[in-house]
């Protein structure tokens, strides 16, 4: 059976050829290797028709142009040579589009990313819509790759090398007005006239290339270029800690093209693409992509979700304000906040105002749209307006009696169908639901701070939670833009449970003489975004350590924190960044101020901070405890799969993405090697390092958590 073409050609009466992109059976247009023959057949027709005045590429999808290349193509490559050949095929196809003798225009609406932008760059002009859905970027670096179809060569010549490097090295996505300002697109128009605007541009004479800004022209010269690449290389190395080989190859390939010409640049690009595709870092990053995509498709349970027309929030503090923002402004669901104090309501409203006003200032949002979104949020000091709310999110203090009281009040003041979701980070959901008249509608919905930035939520049903309650809560989390994992109702749930021994070990090393900055730097070098001591300061030392006694009571001595250290720090009024002093000292300007280690911390905990062990040893001690606890969570079915475990660790605590998550990292080392390391550490430092039974058994049998493919489990 012949495959329906993803590219169709229609010649208008004005002799403009319109090529419509519509991948059959898919919501998103993605480029596949088999499309090359389709495009070449169309190019042949275009060349044969001497009456044509121009060509326009446009998408038939409602909200995307081309979202990128199909990543499965890379996974199907067994060697670097196969992946390189894939890149060369893409380069050749883009070159054939660019070589057409008539004006070729890309009419862009929605996501234009990766291979989609490379196709647009191969065109002679680009018009995009002013819709918020329209974004342009080259995100391949986030998969451990570089643009392989000419993007590293065309983009610097179009918008300048420094701007192009920023886009390619970070995967940054541009909105329409930003793209216009940088010269990436030639015009920005309403969606309703996109095709006609592109057609008019296609009819015009091909313009000479737009002159680059003076700064970019200086940086394109040999001296400026040498200085730029040295500075960018140094900055990139500091940011990546050498853990992401793609960034180094991007710099190398872009510089080759500028110094030696496009032919050498394309050759270097294809070679680098092939080699990067085979790196363990790219394989791990692609596994995270597939896993997160899979999680987003998971409904959480087999039951159909209930309607979600309105949400209530109890508590207008930092978490309540953040939850209100993502519910109203991301999910588009009306929110009513209840707080006993009018100041709490004002705080929550101001939180959303600050977020939206920032978008208006950056021209990412119109003032009218800001006002429309803010109108979805209202407040009250009692339960007026709560009677028909479909779901209530409780974000009050971590106190069991208070949360049980909230359940009782919601059941008294809200409808019989209303779901009660607690944002607890440590209290058992079963205990919160203990006195509920409708316990099947009580569930945990654990957000991470700051709510608007952290992508993960944990959804925690207790033994009596209904399947529909689970499905409805998962549905809400997805609408809020979150990646939800369903976890079992056990102490610490998943993320805090694997994080606690990691932080405990860092504090223990601190008491044994290691310096704060040495510990943090060691884990940043390993690949975490911040070190464990700094993380504790950011979360709040009082907040971050509150869960330790809960975990110790549930799981025993391996969760005990170093005696008296935490109490000594808290008794000295050290809460972390929020009160300006923790392990670090912070200036008076709040969150943007520069921090420095407070030397007074060492005598406070009874050490001189002289340090004795290497950075890799520091990282090993912290990370091995995290891995061991993650395996226990699988064994106890705290998480439903190692997929959820990897996603939870990467999205919830910043476990190094280039390692793929705790379980993929164990597989890369080998379970037997992890067991050997832990047994050595147990001999040196104590029984808390004893490897769990599941890990020992897997090591003995040579088993892995994941199969060889990026998406399947054993």
Curated annotation (Swiss-Prot):
One GO biological process this protein is involved in is: fatty acid beta-oxidation
Organism superkingdom:
Bacteria
| Region described as 3-hydroxyacyl-CoA dehydrogenase | 306-714
Q: Name one GO molecular function term.
A: NAD+ binding
What's in the GO CC field? Answer: cytoplasm; fatty acid beta-oxidation multienzyme complex
**Disulfide bonds listed in the record:** none
Reactions that this protein is recorded to catalyse = a (3S)-3-hydroxyacyl-CoA = a (2E)-enoyl-CoA + H2O; a 4-saturated-(3S)-3-hydroxyacyl-CoA = a (3E)-enoyl-CoA + H2O; a (3S)-3-hydroxyacyl-CoA + NAD(+) = a 3-oxoacyl-CoA + NADH + H(+); (3S)-3-hydroxybutanoyl-CoA = (3R)-3-hydroxybutanoyl-CoA
Annotated CDD domains: crotonase-like (cd06558)
Cellular localisation:
Cytoplasm
EC nos: 4.2.1.17, 5.1.2.3, 1.1.1.35
Region Enoyl-CoA hydratase: start-end pairs = 1-190
Q: Where is this site: Important for catalytic activity?
A: 118, 140
Residue spans making up a coiled coil are none
To which pathway does this protein belong? Lipid metabolism; fatty acid beta-oxidation
Keyword tags: Cytoplasm, Fatty acid metabolism, Isomerase, Lipid degradation, Lipid metabolism, Lyase, Multifunctional enzyme, NAD, Oxidoreductase
Q: Which NCBIfam families match?
A: FadJ, PRK11154.1
Q: How does it assemble?
A: Heterotetramer of two alpha chains (FadJ) and two beta chains (FadI).
Quote the function comment for this protein.
Answer: Catalyzes the formation of a hydroxyacyl-CoA by addition of water on enoyl-CoA. Also exhibits 3-hydroxyacyl-CoA epimerase and 3-hydroxyacyl-CoA dehydrogenase activities. Strongly involved in the anaerobic degradation of long and medium-chain fatty acids in the presence of nitrate and weakly involved in the aerobic degradation of long-chain fatty acids.
The name of this protein is: Fatty acid oxidation complex subunit alpha
Native source species: Escherichia coli (strain K12)
């Amino acid at each position: 059976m012949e495959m329906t073409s993803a590219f169709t050609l229609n010649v208008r009466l004005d002799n403009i050829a319109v090529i419509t992109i519509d991948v059959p059976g898919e919501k998103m247009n993605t480029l596949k290797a088999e499309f090359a023959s389709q495009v070449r057949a169309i190019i042949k027709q275009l060349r044969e028709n001497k009456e044509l005045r121009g060509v326009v590429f446009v998408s038939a999808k409602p909200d995307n142009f081309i979202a990128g290349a199909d990543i499965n193509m890379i996974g199907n490559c067994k060697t670097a040579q196969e992946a390189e050949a894939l890149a060369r095929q893409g380069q050749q196809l883009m070159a054939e589009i660019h070589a057409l003798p008539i004006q070729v225009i890309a009419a862009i609406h929605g996501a234009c990313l990766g291979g989609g932008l490379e196709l647009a760059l191969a065109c002679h002009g680009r018009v995009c819509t002013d819709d918020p859905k329209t974004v342009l970027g080259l995100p391949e670096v986030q998969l451990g790759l570089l643009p392989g179809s000419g993007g590293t060569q065309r983009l610097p010549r179009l918008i300048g090398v420094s701007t192009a490097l920023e886009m390619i090295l970070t995967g940054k996505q541009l909105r329409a007005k930003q793209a216009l300002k940088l010269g990436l697109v030639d015009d920005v128009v309403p969606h309703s006239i996109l095709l006609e605007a592109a057609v008019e541009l296609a009819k015009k004479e091909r313009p000479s290339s737009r002159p680059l800004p003076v700064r970019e022209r200086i940086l394109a010269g040999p001296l400026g270029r040498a200085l730029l690449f040295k500075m960018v290389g140094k900055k990139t190395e500091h940011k990546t800690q050498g853990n992401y080989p793609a960034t180094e190859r991007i710099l190398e390939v872009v510089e080759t093209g500028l110094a030696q010409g496009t032919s050498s640049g394309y050759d270097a690009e294809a070679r680098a693409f092939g080699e990067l595709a085979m790196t363990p870092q790219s394989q791990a990053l692609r596994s995270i992509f597939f896993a997160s995509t899979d999680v987003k498709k998971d409904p959480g349970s087999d039951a159909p979700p209930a309607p979600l027309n309105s949400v209530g929030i109890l508590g207008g503090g930092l978490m309540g304000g953040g939850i209100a923002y993502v519910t109203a402004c991301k999910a588009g669901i009306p929110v009513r906040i209840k707080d006993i104090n009018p100041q709490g309501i004002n705080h929550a409203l101001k939180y959303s105002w600050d977020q939206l006003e920032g978008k208006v200032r950056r021209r990412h949002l119109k003032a009218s749209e800001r006002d429309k979104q803010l109108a979805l949020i209202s407040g009250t000091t009692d339960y007026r307006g709560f009677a028909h709310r479909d779901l209530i999110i409780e974000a009050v203090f971590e106190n069991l009696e208070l949360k049980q009281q909230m359940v009782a009040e919601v059941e008294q003041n809200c409808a019989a169908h209303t779901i009660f979701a607690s944002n607890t980070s440590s209290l058992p959901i079963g205990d919160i639901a203990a006195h509920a008249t409708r316990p099947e509608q009580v569930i945990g919905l654990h957000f991470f701070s700051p709510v608007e930035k952290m992508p993960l939520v944990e959804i925690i049903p207790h033994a009596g939670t209904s399947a529909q309650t689970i499905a409805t809560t998962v549905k809400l989390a997805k609408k809020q833009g979150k990646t939800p994992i369903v976890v079992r109702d056990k102490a610490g749930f998943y993320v805090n449970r694997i994080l606690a021994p990691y932080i405990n070990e860092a504090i223990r090393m601190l008491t044994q003489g290691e310096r704060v900055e040495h510990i943090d730097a060691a884990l940043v070098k390993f690949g975490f975004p911040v070190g464990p001591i700094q993380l504790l300061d950011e979360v709040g030392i009082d907040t971050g350590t509150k869960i330790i006694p809960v975990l110790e009571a549930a799981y025993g001595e391996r969760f005990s924190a170093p005696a008296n250290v935490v109490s000594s720090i808290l008794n000295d009024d050290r809460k972390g960044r929020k009160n300006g002093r923790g392990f670090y000292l912070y200036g008076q300007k709040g969150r943007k101020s520069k921090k420095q280690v407070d030397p007074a911390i060492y005598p406070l905990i009874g050490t001189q901070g002289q340090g004795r062990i290497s950075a890799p040893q520091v990282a090993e001690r912290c990370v091995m405890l995290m891995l061991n606890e993650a395996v226990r969570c699988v064994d106890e079915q705290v998480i439903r799969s190692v997929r959820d475990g990897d996603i939870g660790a990467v999205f919830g605590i910043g476990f190094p993405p280039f390692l793929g998550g705790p379980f993929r990292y164990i597989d890369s080392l080998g379970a037997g090697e992890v067991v050997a390391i832990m047994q050595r550490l147990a001999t040196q430092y104590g029984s808390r390092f004893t490897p769990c039974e599941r890990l020992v058994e897997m090591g003995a049998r040579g088993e892995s958590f994941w199969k060889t493919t990026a998406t399947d489990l054993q």
